[in-house]
């Protein structure tokens, strides 16, 4: 049970710091709204027409695919650095990891997630 006290303390301190920062920000933020505060910031030009521009959801799909396959570098780099020490077992595990990633990429390609519509 004493092993979990550190984890619980870490979670509580994290929540307190997060909530404390949000509360402090709320309490000290400037509340006055005037003409200058509502204008376009710095060198921006005043907008003409509708300011809400809709982005295609295809951008979201590409961004999500990038994040998914970019995270693999976090695992590939340490493996490449310690490749000699890990031996054959490390090589097999990394090939399995890469196979799963390629399988996911193949599935996304098959479902049309990489096609621009």
UniProtKB/Swiss-Prot annotation:
The EC number(s) this enzyme carries: 7.1.1.-
Compartments in which it is found: Cell membrane
Membrane topology: Multi-pass membrane protein
GO molecular function: NADH dehydrogenase (ubiquinone) activity; NADH:ubiquinone reductase (non-electrogenic) activity; quinone binding
Substrates-to-products reaction catalysed: a quinone + NADH + 5 H(+)(in) = a quinol + NAD(+) + 4 H(+)(out)
Record's GO cellular component terms: NADH dehydrogenase complex; plasma membrane
Keywords: Cell membrane, Membrane, NAD, Quinone, Translocase, Transmembrane, Transmembrane helix, Transport
TM regions (residue ranges): 4-24, 64-84, 86-106
InterPro entries: NAD(P)H_OxRDtase_bac/plastid, NADH_UbQ/plastoQ_OxRdtase_su3, NDAH_ubi_oxred_su3_sf
Any Pfam family the entry gives: Oxidored_q4
PANTHER family on file: NADH-UBIQUINONE OXIDOREDUCTASE CHAIN 3
Stated role: NDH-1 shuttles electrons from NADH, via FMN and iron-sulfur (Fe-S) centers, to quinones in the respiratory chain. The immediate electron acceptor for the enzyme in this species is believed to be a menaquinone. Couples the redox reaction to proton translocation (for every two electrons transferred, four hydrogen ions are translocated across the cytoplasmic membrane), and thus conserves the redox energy in a proton gradient.
Subunit structure: NDH-1 is composed of 14 different subunits. Subunits NuoA, H, J, K, L, M, N constitute the membrane sector of the complex.
Family the UniProt entry places it in: Belongs to the complex I subunit 3 family.
Annotated protein name in UniProt: NADH-quinone oxidoreductase subunit A
């Amino acid at each position: 049970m004493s092993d979990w006290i550190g984890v619980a303390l870490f979670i509580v301190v994290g929540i307190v710091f997060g909530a404390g920062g949000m509360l402090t920000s709320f309490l000290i933020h400037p509340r006055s709204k005037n003409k200058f505060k509502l204008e376009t910031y710095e060198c921006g030009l005043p907008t003409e027409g509708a300011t809400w521009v809709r982005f295609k959801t295809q951008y979201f799909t590409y961004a999500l695919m990038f994040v998914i396959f970019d995270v693999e570098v976090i695992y590939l780099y340490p493996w490449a650095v310690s490749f000699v020490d890990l031996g054959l077992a490390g090589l097999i595990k990394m090939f399995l990891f890469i196979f799963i990633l390629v399988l996911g990429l193949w599935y996304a390609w098959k479902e049309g997630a990489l096609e621009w519509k």
